[in-house]
């Protein structure tokens, strides 16, 4: 009798989704902390921007590096979303059924999955806008330019929604990855899961607080500094040329 061949495609797709999700989550963790450099000073945020433009490697600014990085992250984002969407409810009826089941069972992990679906849907639109801006306007990043974008270009509300959705999605995803990859196995799986869940909630709270503080600082600078002349922040300690 001929053995039925096992279809390995679903497993491979799941591995790609998990891997790309891990990469994006780690990127978000670093990105929010780098953005938070504005909380230290304008000069610190400027120096972080210079680092990503390659100044400390080449001795000159190359904003195109940021465009390349944004395009790379965007490609990973599209790949991740394209694979993940196959697990989304196919219709509103399916969504309603899952929601009712989650509320009836009061199963927190099912609720977390629903949060990921909703935040993932939000990110598909909001995240795409942010990535497009970073790809097309890499030179407009800095204490004054970024703050002007938040206030003068009315991007503040969008960044607020993006912060909440991306942080929630990322850390819930990391929790579910830890569960899937066996990091919670041990003598007492229930205790391990509770500890990982507590860590997830603490990290979500931490990153949202840091992100909101940064957004508030950018908003303050955008309100108090007139960027209508388009003059970027000038470092007090560095003389930088742009290419």
Range-by-range predicted roles:
Residues 1-243:
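Membrane-embedded alpha-helical bundles that constitute the cytochrome b-like, heme-associated redox core
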């Amino acid at each position: 009798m001929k053995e039925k061949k096992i279809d390995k495609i679903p497993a491979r797709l799941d591995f790609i989704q998990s891997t790309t999700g891990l990469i994006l989550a780690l990127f978000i963790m670093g990105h929010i902390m780098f953005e938070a450099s504005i909380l230290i000073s304008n000069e610190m945020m400027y120096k972080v921007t210079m680092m990503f433009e390659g100044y400390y490697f080449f001795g000159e600014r190359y904003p195109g590096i940021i465009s390349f990085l944004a395009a790379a992250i965007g490609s990973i984002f599209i790949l991740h979303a394209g694979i993940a969407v196959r697990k989304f409810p196919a219709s509103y009826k399916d969504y309603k059924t899952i929601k009712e089941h989650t509320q009836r069972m009061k199963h927190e992990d099912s609720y977390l999955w629903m949060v990921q679906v909703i935040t993932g849907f939000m990110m598909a639109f909001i995240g795409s806008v942010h990535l497009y801006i970073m790809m097309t306007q890499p030179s407009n990043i800095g204490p004054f330019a970024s703050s002007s974008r938040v206030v003068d270009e009315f991007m503040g509300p969008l960044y607020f929604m993006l912060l909440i959705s991306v942080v929630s999605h990322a850390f819930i995803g990391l929790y579910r990855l830890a569960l899937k990859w066996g990091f919670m196995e041990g003598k007492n799986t229930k205790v391990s899961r509770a500890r990982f869940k507590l860590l997830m909630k603490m990290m979500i709270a931490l990153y949202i607080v840091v992100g909101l503080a940064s957004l508030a600082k950018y908003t303050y600078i955008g309100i108090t500094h007139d960027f209508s002349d388009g003059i970027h922040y000038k470092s007090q300690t560095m003389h930088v040329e742009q290419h």
